[in-house]
Amino acid sequence: MDQYSSSLVDTSLDLTIGVTRMRVEEDPPTSALVEELNRVSAENKKLSEMLTLMCDNYNVLRKQLMEYVNKSNITERDQISPPKKRKSPAREDAFSCAVIGGVSESSSTDQDEYLCKKQREETVVKEKVSRVYYKTEASDTTLVVKDGYQWRKYGQKVTRDNPSPRAYFKCACAPSCSVKKKVQRSVEDQSVLVATYEGEHNHPMPSQIDSNNGLNRHISHGGSASTPVAANRRSSLTVPVTTVDMIESKKVTSPTSRIDFPQVQKLLVEQMASSLTKDPNFTAALAAAVTGKLYQQNHTEK
């Protein structure tokens, strides 16, 4: 049987075409890679924390260095310049002075002084604004108000709320007298001039000065008025001064309460004349002056 089987021919068909079998190599295990990745991530995180801590320490050191430098500068400045003398709290806001080597130096800035001065000027102007109404003729188209003072016109313009133009005047004694005046016709009544004054005059009226000078010339020309009489005359001239409040009251809103300046001037003249006639010294001086004048005229005619 064994011999028979060995003598048989192997008739099996080999279907392979000569291609060798390929062995598929398996990948290494991924656990090692995952472990390496975790290690690198942990190292990066640790480095980031160290860098953050280093930045914080740098900022703290830098802040301490700046504080030390500032303190050093302040100490050096205090050693070079002596301490300033502290003034009272009331005047501390206005200015503070430090005396260095006998020379006074003001530590307040020019801007602060300018603002304080401007605020004071505005306060004074607001407190001294007055308005006066003057009655004029219907045919009078000028904006001239005769209030006893001399003015200089420096401008004129038309406003939106009034068809009549507004004229601007300043005192003829400027810049020593800073009073200003605005004149414009009333919207309700075109025959009424509204004069707005800003400030107060620091000098008497020119008309009063002229009248006083005329009386002085009259009495001195007579030659018989003594010094006490002249002193009494001057005192009598200064007594009957009547102050007229020309400031418009806030309660008056209509142009019915107006002040006629010629009537006020007439009242002042009457009061002055009555007070002068009641003074016996002035009467005697006036009589002596008139007598001396008549005597000189008669002597000249002869």
Swiss-Prot record:
Signal peptide: none annotated. The keyword Isomerase does not apply. Keywords: DNA-binding, Nucleus, Transcription, Transcription regulation. It is found in: Nucleus. GO terms for cellular component: nucleus. Pfam families: WRKY. GO terms for biological process: defense response to bacterium; defense response to fungus; negative regulation of DNA-templated transcription; regulation of defense response; response to molecule of bacterial origin; response to salicylic acid; response to wounding. The keyword Iron does not apply. SMART domains: WRKY. One of its GO terms (molecular function) is DNA-binding transcription factor activity. Transcription factor. Interacts specifically with the W box (5'-(T)TGAC[CT]-3'), a frequently occurring elicitor-responsive cis-acting element. This is Probable WRKY transcription factor 40.
